[in-house]
Amino acid sequence: MGVQVETITEGDGRTFPKKGQTVVVHYVGSLENGKKFDSSRDRNKPFKFIIGRCEVIRGWEEGVAQMSVGQRARLTCSPDFAYGATGHPGIIPPNATLTFDVELLRLE
């Protein structure tokens, strides 16, 4: 499956991240059963990463790159676009499909 992007709230439709740009997002990550495993919103601190530097899972690299500034979307990432057969011990089980509610706040 890779990554599926479903828009929750439209962005500006014009400003998309480019390779090498820093994106600033708020997100909530959930397992298939709906259990939340991580949230920048709970910490009240947006998360930043650089597009194209493999700093995040592939589902984020490809999914967030399709979003425009201001957009909020649900990213559904198959295991091969998330943490794969290894998972993240104690947090994400092996071969887990993950869902992220991501809002692209701005580019830097």
UniProtKB/Swiss-Prot annotation:
Any Pfam family hit: FKBP_C
UniProt superkingdom: Eukaryota
Subcellular location: Cytoplasm
EC number, UniProt record: 5.2.1.8
Domain PPIase FKBP-type: 20-108
Keywords: Cytoplasm, Isomerase, Rotamase
Summary of activators and inhibitors of this protein: Inhibited by both FK506 and rapamycin.
Keyword Isomerase applies: yes
Transmembrane intervals: none
One BP annotation, GO: supramolecular fiber organization
Catalysis: reaction(s): [protein]-peptidylproline (omega=180) = [protein]-peptidylproline (omega=0)
Predominant subcellular localization, coarse grouping: cytoplasm
GO molecular function, one term: SMAD binding
One Gene Ontology cellular component: membrane
Similarity comment text for this entry: Belongs to the FKBP-type PPIase family. FKBP1 subfamily.
UniProt function note: Keeps in an inactive conformation TGFBR1, the TGF-beta type I serine/threonine kinase receptor, preventing TGF-beta receptor activation in absence of ligand. May modulate the RYR1 calcium channel activity. PPIases accelerate the folding of proteins. It catalyzes the cis-trans isomerization of proline imidic peptide bonds in oligopeptides.
Name of the molecule in the record: Peptidyl-prolyl cis-trans isomerase FKBP1A
Record lineage: Eukaryota, Metazoa, Chordata, Craniata, Vertebrata
